[in-house]
């Protein structure tokens, strides 16, 4: 282990030396750029663009381009990037993460790689965690970019599609991570190319990259529509049952935060819901409601995991920032279960139309980089998942903050008593204090204690985050006391007021350790910016979540033997033990995120295929007849091959039914037409006849443009419907294969194999529906604005009719389980009408 650490440190030192040499080359242009007039300096942008278009690489332009930005920043912003900022900019251009401490000027650092990469004309996305930071940075740094001749756009959730498109067309676009993700998903749901807002994803520079790519990595962005099934009553019933349970009726795993019914709980469920066996296959849906009710009531905590707004809505609290996540809802029914628990209106369940995780969204960029002050602890994950390194950048001035050893108390009560005494003492001498908490509940509790102690203060948490920037900006003033959840105003510097340096600078007090060392380091990093003095102190108790999860029993015995109920233990060894516990949690969380990615990669591969084909259809300015006719041909082949092993009479009858109900006019084909033909000849006969029907169908449309429109909308509507169902099916499959792990099967391998088979089935089903709708749609001449509505409703009506289109006199008992269903769904019999037998 020591050798590994030594190697890592040596590699970092070597990288720093290399970056220093590159920064020196930038500095060599300093006098040359300073000698230019404003117009001459601005003209450099046009020169660089021309050189790039003529084949020169961005790497070769780096030194001059960075020098231009430095000089431009000095003239426009009154800021002149330091050497360490230039070094950080080089790391960003190379697609890595520079770890730069709080207050080292990351926003100014970003201007150099952003400018350089914008010269390509392919677009640069500067990604922030909230819209306040997007607007602030776009306004402040946009002044520099505009002066240098580059266009700057801000992409906000409130903007119209046209405004969004204009923002994305700019050389540099500022946006939040969630809005980029939702725009990507919505772009892949439109029917016309002109309604897409994004260009191909080129270069993303992510601010607070650890928050977005690590903390929110598992968060799926979901575009959804309403589910047709009414389920609110079931949520209320499950909630009522769960609230009636005793502690012996369920089992909670504190470490993994999972919960399940005990034997007595199962007995009570069977009695409550009047069931013989709770885990019978027909009760799968009910067990899902019960599982969610258990999680909602005994795992999810009010004012920690979520808050109830004044509008009686459940708002999720981000565990890493403490902010409420507006517009976000827990998936898979958990949100509705919490609504039932809290007695607020239950909103309709939704069906996912499109989804993507941040892991897969940002891996789609040609180049990805980001900035953070605390990335080294997650270097393995950055490297393994995103193929980017974390390079620690030296501070411009030495860090003077004093980080005290942790203080450990026996109880939460004695811990908070000590916190209040410490805050009061510092307040009385005028030293500003920032108290960091992990939950809204804790910040409210400390606030009440400080009020009782006569200490005026500000509270910053999920309930009043709209005042975040204002509160944080004043947190470094003399006598200021600020209580903040983990959000702690990331992105907003705390500047020290007059006379505060002499008092020791800002003191950061942590009220418990987070499960991630990185979050603790972020809190510490609020103090001691740019060489300022400062202090940090963490107060812990044996009753804290982290301590309970990892061995507080032994320490509890020490407190009892020494009779130290009100006193603290302080030692470096204790701090190391806590950090070792945090490493174990971080390792568990990383393993979980890695497994999520393995599952999500299955959907990623399938999504890329569907979206690529969809894009090809949307952007096609051609007759799509070859594509549709190929689908018709493959559909015919699947149906004929699917009945190859049946008896001749049964086979011909099934193929005839398929042709009548899905392919040709009912009275245009008879059994005699198919008798005596080989399977190959049947395929050819049906295909040739279908081509005539196809020509007849398109001849009813007004002109060539109407044909293209009809073809395009037809394909897209079928693809979108099938893809939505497929997403839902994959989600159900994922839940199902988890249980197969108990049978010694690898659930990920099972998911990959089954998901691949389901995808192929979906492709067949898409081609079947396109065939049937193309051949059976009742086409009328329509004006263009109405054409989309017409085909959409026709498709919906035909799909509904198709689901019931089984000939009444057909003997289903003679059909093999793996043969295609004769109803024409394109599914195997066992997965269609065979389910009902």
Curated annotation (Swiss-Prot):
Cofactor list: Zn(2+)
Single Gene Ontology BP annotation: protein targeting
Enzyme Commission number(s) of this protein: 7.4.2.8
Binding site for ATP: 85, 103-107, 493
Superkingdom field: Bacteria
Record PROSITE patterns: SECA (PS01312), SECA_MOTOR_DEAD (PS51196)
Molecular function terms from GO: ATP binding; metal ion binding; protein-exporting ATPase activity
Enzyme class: translocase
Keywords per UniProt: ATP-binding, Cell membrane, Cytoplasm, Membrane, Metal-binding, Nucleotide-binding, Protein transport, Translocase, Translocation, Transport, Zinc
Binding note for cofactor: May bind 1 zinc ion per subunit.
Membrane topology: Peripheral membrane protein
InterPro entries: Helicase_ATP-bd, Helicase_C-like, P-loop_NTPase, SEC_C_motif, SecA, SecA_CS, SecA_DEAD, SecA_motor_DEAD
Main location: membrane
UniProt GO cellular component terms: cell envelope Sec protein transport complex; cytosol; plasma membrane
Record: residues binding Zn(2+): 821, 823, 832-833
Pfam families per the UniProt record, alphabetical: P-loop_SecA (PF21090), SEC-C (PF02810), SecA_DEAD (PF07517), SecA_PP_bind (PF01043), SecA_SW (PF07516)
Compartmental location: Cell membrane; Cytoplasm
Cystine pairs: none
Enzymatic reactions: ATP + H2O + cellular proteinSide 1 = ADP + phosphate + cellular proteinSide 2
Subunit structure: Monomer and homodimer. Part of the essential Sec protein translocation apparatus which comprises SecA, SecYEG and auxiliary proteins SecDF. Other proteins may also be involved.
Job of this protein: Part of the Sec protein translocase complex. Interacts with the SecYEG preprotein conducting channel. Has a central role in coupling the hydrolysis of ATP to the transfer of proteins into and across the cell membrane, serving as an ATP-driven molecular motor driving the stepwise translocation of polypeptide chains across the membrane.
UniProt similarity note: Belongs to the SecA family.
The protein, known as: Protein translocase subunit SecA 1
Organism field: Streptococcus pneumoniae serotype 4 (strain ATCC BAA-334 / TIGR4)
Gene coding for it: secA1
């Amino acid at each position: 282990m020591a050798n590994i650490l030594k190697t890592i440190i040596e590699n970092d030192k070597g990288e720093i030396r290399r970056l220093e040499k590159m920064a020196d080359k930038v500095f060599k242009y300093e006098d040359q750029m300073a000698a230019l007039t404003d117009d001459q300096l601005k003209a450099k942008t046009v020169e660089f663009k021309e050189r790039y278009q003529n084949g020169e690489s961005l790497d070769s332009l780096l030194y001059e381009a960075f020098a231009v930005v430095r000089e431009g920043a000095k003239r426009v912003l009154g800021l002149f990037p330091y050497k360490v900022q230039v070094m950080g900019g080089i790391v960003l251009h190379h697609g890595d993460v520079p770890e730069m401490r709080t207050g080292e000027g990351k926003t100014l650092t970003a201007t150099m790689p952003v400018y350089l990469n914008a010269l390509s004309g392919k677009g640069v996305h500067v990604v922030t965690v909230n819209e306040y930071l997007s607007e602030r940075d776009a306004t402040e740094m946009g002044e520099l970019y505009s002066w240098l001749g580059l266009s700057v756009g801000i992409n906000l959730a409130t903007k119209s599609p046209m405004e969004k498109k204009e923002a994305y067309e700019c050389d540099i676009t500022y946006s939040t991570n969630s809005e980029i993700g939702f725009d990507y998903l919505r772009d892949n749901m439109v029917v016309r190319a002109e309604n897409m807002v994004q260009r191909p994803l080129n270069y993303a520079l992510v601010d607070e990259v650890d928050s977005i790519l690590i903390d929110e990595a598992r968060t799926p962005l979901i575009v959804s529509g309403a589910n047709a099934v009414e389920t609110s009553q079931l949520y209320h019933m499950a909630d009522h049952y769960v609230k009636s349970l005793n502690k012996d009726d369920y089992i909670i795993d504190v470490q993994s935060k999972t919960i399940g019914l005990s034997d007595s709980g199962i007995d009570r469920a069977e009695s409550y819901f009047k069931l013989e066996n709770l885990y019978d296959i027909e009760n799968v849906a009910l067990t899902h409601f019960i599982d969610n009710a258990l999680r909602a009531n005994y795992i999810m905590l009010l004012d920690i995991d979520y808050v109830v707004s004044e509008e009686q809505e459940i708002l999720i609290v981000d565990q890493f920032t403490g902010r409420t996540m507006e517009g976000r809802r827990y998936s898979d029914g958990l949100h509705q279960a919490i609504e039932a628990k809290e007695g607020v209106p239950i909103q309709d369940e939704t069906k996912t139309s499109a989804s993507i995780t941040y892991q897969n969204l940002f891996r789609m960029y040609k180049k990805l980089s980001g900035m953070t002050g605390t990335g080294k602890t997650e270097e393995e994950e950055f490297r393994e998942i995103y193929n980017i390194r974390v390079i620690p950048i030296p501070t411009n001035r030495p860090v003077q903050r004093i980080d005290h050893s942790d203080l450990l108390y026996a109880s939460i009560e004695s811990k908070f008593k000590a916190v209040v005494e410490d805050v009061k003492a510092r307040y009385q001498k005028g030293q500003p204090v920032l108290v960091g908490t992990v939950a809204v509940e804790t910040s409210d509790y400390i606030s009440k204690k400080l009020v009782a102690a006569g200490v005026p203060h500000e509270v910053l948490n999920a309930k009043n985050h709209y005042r975040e920037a204002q509160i944080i900006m004043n947190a470094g003033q003399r006598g200021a006391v600020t209580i903040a959840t983990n959000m702690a105003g990331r992105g907003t510097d705390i500047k020290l007021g007059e006379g505060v340096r002499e008092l020791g600078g800002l003191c950061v007090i942590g009220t418990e350790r987070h499960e991630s060392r990185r979050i603790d380091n972020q809190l510490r990093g609020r103090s001691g910016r740019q060489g300022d003095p400062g202090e940090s102190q963490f107060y812990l108790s044996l009753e804290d979540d982290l301590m309970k999860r990892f061995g507080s029993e032994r320490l509890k015995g020490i407190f009892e033997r020494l009779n130290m109920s009100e006193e603290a233990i302080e030692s470096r060894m204790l701090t190391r033990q806590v950090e070792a516990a945090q490493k174990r949690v971080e390792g568990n969380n990383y393993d979980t995120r890695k497994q999520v990615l393995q599952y999500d990669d299955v959907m990623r591969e399938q999504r890329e295929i569907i979206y690529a084909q969809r894009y090809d259809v949307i952007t096609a300015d051609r007759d799509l007849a070859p594509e549709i006719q190929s689908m018709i041909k493959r559909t015919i082949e699947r149906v004929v091959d699917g009945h190859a092993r049946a008896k001749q009479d049964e086979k011909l009858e099934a193929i005839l039914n398929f042709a009548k109900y899905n392919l040709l006019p009912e009275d245009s084909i008879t059994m005699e037409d198919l008798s005596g033909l080989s399977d190959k000849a049947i395929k050819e006969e049906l295909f040739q006849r279908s081509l005539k029907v196809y020509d007849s169908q398109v001849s009813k449309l007004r002109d060539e443009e109407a044909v293209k429109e009809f073809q395009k909308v037809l394909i897209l509507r079928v693809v979108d419907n099938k893809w939505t169902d497929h997403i839902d099916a994959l989600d159900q499959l994922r839940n199902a294969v988890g249980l197969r792990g108990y049978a010694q099967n690898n659930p990920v391998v099972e998911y990959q194999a089954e998901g691949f088979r389901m995808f192929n089935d979906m492709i067949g089903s898409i081609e079947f529906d396109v065939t049937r709708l193309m051949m059976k749609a009742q086409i009328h001449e329509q004006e263009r604005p109405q054409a989309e509505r017409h085909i959409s409703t026709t498709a919906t009506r035909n799909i509904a009719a198709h689901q019931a289109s089984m000939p009444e006199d057909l003997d289903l008992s003679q059909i093999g389980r793996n043969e295609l269903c004769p109803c024409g769904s394109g599914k195997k019999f066992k997965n269609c009408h065979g389910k009902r037998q």
